[in-house]
Amino acid sequence: MEKRNSVDTFIKKNQNFEEKVIVRRTSDLLLTSKQNKGLKYLNNQKNSKELLKSPSKNKIKGLINSNTILENEFKQAAPNLNKAFKDFSFIQFQNESYRDYMEDRFSILMNFPNDDNDKAIFAIFDGHGGSSISEYLCENFISVFLKYYQKYEKQNIEKILQKCFSTLNDEIKKISKSDEMGSTATIIFLTKETNQLLGSKKIIYCANVGDTNCELFSKNNCKRLTYEHRCSDSIEENRIKKNNGNIINGRIGGRMEISRSFGDFRLKDYGLICEPSINKMSINFNEKYLLILATDGIWDFVSEEEMFFITMNNNDSMEICKLIVDKAKENGSTDNMTCIIINL
């Protein structure tokens, strides 16, 4: 196995957040969120064949925490960029004045097996009742996806995503010590499709449970790719009631506002499920788009109009991340916040 690059770590104080920012350099392909606060990344990583050989060991050997390359290496990395995206940035903000713990997590896979460099996965998880389930998903979602990706020969991404949610929720039920912990999830899978008549297009698959949302921004408009699963939604309310569930004071079983999640097994009899909403859309290669994934600590406090204004008036994805989190704080958010900006 190729020897890893040396890891450079530095800590700086960000004027906006007064938070430690930990940045590391590596050639590895997986990025997860155990320590990162915020940084920008252009990928320069080796292939990932070993992940499919033993996905069950991925959380120990294949999953590298909090690793990126440094900003001054972006141009050097450019010849090896993943074709699915141009760059991405992210910020995680605990909001320590109000929150004792960080329950948000994310995982990112930037190169697929067999040097398949036109695909990528971005996954974001917002835990509640503790971080155990969001942490488990952070460490295991991508390895389970790769297992099914190989099994179903890459042909049915919707089926692969459904199997991932079902399998992981079943595993969580087996090992969880509490039925009061849970997590939302939003998964983005980027790929391309080629048609003899229409040519090649970028394809975005989005799967989610809960209220961790994703929107696609262009110069003219924005489109939400996730479906927000809350008891206040009429479709979710009808589904719950049709299945003999119950909503009390706008909460499923009188306990929780979201109606789909991983875990939260005490609410299963009240109508809570872990079946994802899945959306697929195509975009042109020659047009500029930004994907924004964020937890509800941001979406509940930053309007679509405010996000659109920020994206239209700034070109740098890291700066957009900072401005969005600043706006959420300014508008009164007291929650953990995670924001990922993907420049397509």
What is the predicted function of each stretch?
Residues 2-3, 7-14, 21-25, 31, ...:
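PP2C/PPM-type serine/threonine phosphatase catalytic core
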Residues 14-16, 47:
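Exposed regions on extracellular, virion, or secretory-pathway luminal proteins
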